[in-house]
């Protein structure tokens, strides 16, 4: 495969920079695996953070490393699994790299903290925009005008 497009797996995978190696998914994915699946017409590569059962449907709870929204993906929608990637010319093997395993476990464990920080960051940005608009230093954008009718 080629370089990732987007920032949902940052800081592990960098937009249009690193090169990924994805293989077909065989069997059950484990927690911390990075799954390739289809969302609409786009391919998405996100980390498995858990499993779910909904009646007869079984699947994975998935989230990007730079995301805070959990997704519930049925098993049959998973197309592949990340087996390794090249970062600045250095090969990282997702099966054997101790550093990769430590990063994966730490990143998933910090999910609640990351979610709280992203929420706080968004609130500070919104408040900052309101102050700039109130002081006349910035025009209110069309999206916020439409939401405040």
Describe the predicted segments one by one:
Residues 1-149:
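Extended hydrophobic leader/signal-anchor segments used for secretion and membrane insertion
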């Amino acid at each position: 495969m080629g370089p990732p497009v987007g920032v949902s797996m940052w800081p592990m995978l960098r937009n249009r920079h690193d090169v990924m190696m994805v293989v077909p998914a065989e069997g059950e994915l484990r927690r911390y695996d990075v799954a390739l699946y289809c969302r609409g017409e786009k391919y998405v590569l996100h980390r498995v953070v858990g499993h779910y059962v909904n009646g007869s449907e079984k699947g994975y709870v998935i989230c990007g490393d730079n995301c805070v929204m959990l997704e519930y993906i049925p098993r049959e929608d998973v197309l592949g699994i990340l087996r390794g990637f090249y970062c600045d010319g250095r090969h990282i093997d997702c099966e054997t790299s101790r550093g990769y395993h430590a990063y994966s476990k730490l990143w998933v464990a910090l999910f609640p903290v990351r979610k709280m920080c992203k929420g706080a960051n968004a609130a500070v940005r919104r408040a900052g925009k309101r102050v700039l608009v109130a002081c006349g230093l910035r025009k209110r954008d069309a999206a916020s005008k439409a939401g405040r009718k």
